[in-house]
Amino acid sequence: MTHLSDLDIANQATIKPISEIAEKIGIPEDALEQYGHYKAKIDINKLDDKGDRGKVVLVTAMSPTPAGEGKSTVTVGLADAFHELGENVMMALREPALGPVFGIKGGATGGGYAQVLPMEDINLHFNGDFHAITTANNALAAFIDNHIHQGNELGIDQRRIEWKRVLDMNDRELRKVVVGLGGPTQGVPREDGFNITVASEIMTILCLSTGLKDLKASIANITIGYTRDRKPVTVADLKVEGALAMILKDAIKPNLVQSIEGTPALIHGGPFANIAHGCNSIIATETARKLADIVVTEAGFGSDLGAEKFMNIKARKAGFEPSAAVVVATIRALKMHGGVAKDDLKEENVQAVRDGLANLERHIENIRSFGVEPVVALNAFVSDTEAEEQVVEDWAKEHGVRIALTEVWEKGGKGGVELAKQVQEVLNEKHDFKHTYDLDLPIEEKIEKVVTNIYGGNKVTFTSGALKQLKQIKENGWDNYPVCMAKTQYSFTDDKDRLGAPDDFEITIRELQPKTGAGFIVALTGAIMTMPGLPKKPAALNMDVTEDGHAKGLF
């Protein structure tokens, strides 16, 4: 049986004018800033605030395969299923980054009949937010280099500049560069480098800000580098926070689109979860909570990355808590964690599924450690067999875990109704939300609590360089920040090839990066890169555009 591609399904869908979607959810006309017929930004200052706030459902996943387990698809399908059940629901998602779109993932707007539209636009530039973030980031880099060129009044040490330029593309050649070459009129030569835009602190700040005032204050707090006597230099010292916030004045407004079934969706911000905090913007989530009774949102990768940071960073900053969580699992991911090679994941292997359940179980335990009850969404693929699915369902029943076979890729919202009903049950229960650590703990203890309580490790070690950075963090009074772990998404450890649910391991912290604008400390582990590279056969090889301007190959 031949299935339509995600792009074909999206192109065949009937999409409503965005003004209709806005009216349905209660957004006044003067708050809607349309970008064509099917996309808009929302001026949150013009929304009526009735005081009520919707309940948040967080969608996370088990440790994924390289292809992903369909978390965005399940998020969209679950929202559509709530809509099918008559609930007043919205979803709040991250924007796709162009680098991964052209790299290994292709499009990132859900899949099958559980997609957000217009799919082409969202995957390619959307409403210009990433361009604005890239511009603001690189404007700051230009201001820094210009300050040094014009006499360096602040005494910035060129060897200790922490701010890098960014690009919304996977480009390994730009990880390390030299700028300022060409003589006295071309600037001051120094080593520099590029990150991908989603790793920019500007991206994180936009996603953690509650408004323009908060955005500008956070930008002012960014530490761009140090003087020769190792005193921090901030954006406030350069006096350019106003200019940078001005560049972002429209980007901070959340973007309104819709699913194939007409469910409203706010898509805003897109930090990665393995190198940043991996959640959409607080502004989008809070806007959805003002407008809907249920808000379905997602956090990148598994409970050890995006969900952990959602709980300990985003929810803490925003002052809300999730009322339920969904853990997306797939038969293929279970088999991978049960020892099956990537090329054999489509072959039936009941024992491997059984062995891989240890990984899923740890993710369930992680969600419960926050005082939130999870529901497992077993996301169906055509290669799954009844025997494999039965193993998972029997295990869930034996362990008291709610589970629903989820077929939203094939059936849209109707394929997620059972999942939505299970989540409804959880939403009606009381829960006692808690964080993994208190903010007044030392940085090293916060990291240790994440490693032992979330990853299942037994020890944390710091390189000599990280220990020096830890000392500097304490001297500068930054040790009351939360921690943002930069770690592989494929394993609970810092080794991407150590799958399953190991418990006899240590995590090595090789670098600590204070993100004083965003308000957290990044702890880098393993071989995590903040500028990815493209694979040998990037998804771009299958992409094209027709003579009438329609994209091809966006999955």
From Swiss-Prot:
Keywords noted in UniProt: ATP-binding, Ligase, Nucleotide-binding, One-carbon metabolism
InterPro entries the record matches: Formate_THF_ligase (IPR000559), Formate_THF_ligase_CS (IPR020628), P-loop_NTPase (IPR027417)
Catalytic activity field: (6S)-5,6,7,8-tetrahydrofolate + formate + ATP = (6R)-10-formyltetrahydrofolate + ADP + phosphate
EC number: 6.3.4.3
The keyword Nucleotide-binding is assigned to this record: yes
Binding sites annotated in the UniProt record for ATP: 65-72
SUPFAM superfamilies according to UniProt: P-loop containing nucleoside triphosphate hydrolases
GO biological process: tetrahydrofolate interconversion
UniProt GO MF annotations: ATP binding; formate-tetrahydrofolate ligase activity
Pathway where this protein functions: One-carbon metabolism; tetrahydrofolate interconversion
Disulphide-bridged cysteine pairs: none
Record Pfam families: FTHFS (PF01268)
Coiled coil (residue ranges): none
NCBIfam families tied to this protein: PRK13505.1
Family statement: Belongs to the formate--tetrahydrofolate ligase family.
Record's protein name: Formate--tetrahydrofolate ligase
